[in-house]
């Protein structure tokens, strides 16, 4: 693990451990398991992503630590509808409150207004958070290698699969990729072009790490995709899956921003 102390990521992770302790007092794991069993059926996240080209995970995000408020007029239901009409394969929904102004209920709100599967975009630190994601009606979870140990990654991905959730494992460099590749091949791999220690963006991060993967392994590029040229650059390197949020969220019509960036994705 990288040293994340004195970074934004470190502050977020510290807050997540505080949140976890508070949530465990409110509702024990057994109760959350019961809620997870009663949740709406899982929609296949990985399957949806693999059957669209380009496969776009479109993000519902109000704010971020680096940019502050990105979208003041924030309506998750309307955004989800627009993304589906534009041709998104999946949704990514921020649930972190303190740093991204997200909310747990936004997953259900978004899913109730479209047929797309949804990723719970948050900084999960314990298997409890994984079960909680299913209870919130998520179809996929995010595991960020930079803030989890190998044991946590293994345990949390296993818990996810036991609850029929897909898993997106996020890496930023070669060392993190090496750790991610120890996990089940069932896991989706995402490369964050944003350095979570400095928040600088470099699109070449995805291209560099793609070369270390078998050609058959699907890779998702995350952060910094802002122009059609950015999309073409990725496609020229056989990268066809994208997670995009800010580029859509800062435009008045996210669906029009989607089309301007990706055109009309095709079902494959």
Curated annotation (Swiss-Prot):
It comes from the Bacteria. InterPro entries: Aldolase_TIM, Indole-3-glycerol_P_synth, Indole-3-glycerol_P_synth_dom, Indole-3-GlycerolPSynthase_CS, RibuloseP-bd_barrel. GO terms for molecular function: indole-3-glycerol-phosphate synthase activity; phosphoribosylanthranilate isomerase activity. Pathway: Amino-acid biosynthesis; L-tryptophan biosynthesis; L-tryptophan from chorismate: step 4/5. It catalyses: 1-(2-carboxyphenylamino)-1-deoxy-D-ribulose 5-phosphate + H(+) = (1S,2R)-1-C-(indol-3-yl)glycerol 3-phosphate + CO2 + H2O. It is an enzyme of class 4 (lyase). Keywords: Amino-acid biosynthesis, Aromatic amino acid biosynthesis, Decarboxylase, Lyase, Tryptophan biosynthesis. PANTHER family: INDOLE-3-GLYCEROL-PHOSPHATE SYNTHASE, TRYPTOPHAN BIOSYNTHESIS PROTEIN. This is Indole-3-glycerol phosphate synthase. It comes from Acinetobacter baumannii (strain ACICU). The gene is trpC.
């Amino acid at each position: 693990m990288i040293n994340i102390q004195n970074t934004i990521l470190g502050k977020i992770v510290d807050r997540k451990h505080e949140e976890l302790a508070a949530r465990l007092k409110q509702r024990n794991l057994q109760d959350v398991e019961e809620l997870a069993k009663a949740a709406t059926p899982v929609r296949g996240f990985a399957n949806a992503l693999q059957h669209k080209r380009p496969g776009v995970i479109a993000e519902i995000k109000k704010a971020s630590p680096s940019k502050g408020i990105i979208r003041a007029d924030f309506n998750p239901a309307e955004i989800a509808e627009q993304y589906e009409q534009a041709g998104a394969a999946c949704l990514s929904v921020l649930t972190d409150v303190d740093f991204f102004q997200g909310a747990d209920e936004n997953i259900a709100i978004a899913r109730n207004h479209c047929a797309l599967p949804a990723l719970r975009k948050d900084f999960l630190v314990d298997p409890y958070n994984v079960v909680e994601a299913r209870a919130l009606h998520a179809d996929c979870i995010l595991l960020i290698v930079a803030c989890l140990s190998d044991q946590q990654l293994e345990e949390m991905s296993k818990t996810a699969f036991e609850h029929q959730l897909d898993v997106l494992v996020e890496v930023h460099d070669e060392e993190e990729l090496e750790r991610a590749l120890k996990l089940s091949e069932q896991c989706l791999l995402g490369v964050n072009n944003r350095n979570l220690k400095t928040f600088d963006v470099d699109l070449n991060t995805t291209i560099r790490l793609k070369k270390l993967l078998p050609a058959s392994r699907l890779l998702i590029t995350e952060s910094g995709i802002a122009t059609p040229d950015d999309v073409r650059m990725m496609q020229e390197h056989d990268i066809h899956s994208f997670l995009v949020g800010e580029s859509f969220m800062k435009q008045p019509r996210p669906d029009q921003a989607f089309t301007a960036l990706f055109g009309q994705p095709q079902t494959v």
